[in-house]
Amino acid sequence: YTTLFRSEYLYLDLNTCERCMGTDKVLEGVLDELSNAFKMAGYSLEYHKVKIETAEMANAYRFLSSPTIRVNGRDICNSVQENNCGCCGDIAGTQVDCRVFSYNGETYEVPPAEMIAEAIMRMAFRPKVSSCCSGGYVLPDNLKKFFDGKHQKCCESTCSCGCC
């Protein structure tokens, strides 16, 4: 029989944000490298990319910070660390903090492949526990600022979202 292994990549932008684009590229490379090993171990790999476009989507996905990588519903990071993301600030027209990744005593805006591979392997084969998405959720202030700023910027220009 085959066991399902689910990986999700949640992000704000893949056109402008260097963190999101870089993490996307590294994650896809890691999943490509690991896919044969998972197949050999009897795992079926399911991969989903989710662009979080609204505060409502962020709430539905219990999105804490961009970018986020989840394995079987659990964030690969034990905590959320952030710093100013100029790219997302440009999108929203206001200062926005996005995720940074700590690995082996260093901090990265784009996580190294080794960190992602190690986290995926550790989480894929650990016993099933309740997902990170249980319990209370409140939209983090950084995401509220991003979505509010993005909406305001859209409405000040030629509104393409149809909300104004």
Language-model region placement:
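Short, small-residue-biased leader/transition segments that mark boundaries at the very start
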Residues: Y1-L4
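Local cysteine-cluster metal-coordination motifs and their immediate loop/turn environment
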Residues: N15-E18, C87-G89, K153-C164
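Short, flexible/disordered intra-domain loops and linkers
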Residues: T16-G22, E82-N83
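Typically the conserved alpha-helix immediately C-terminal to a functionally engaged Cys/Sec
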Residues: C20-N36
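Alpha-helix termini
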Residues: D32-G42, P127
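Thiol/selenol-based redox catalytic cores and closely related redox-interacting motifs
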Residues: I52-N59, L64-S66, R70-G149
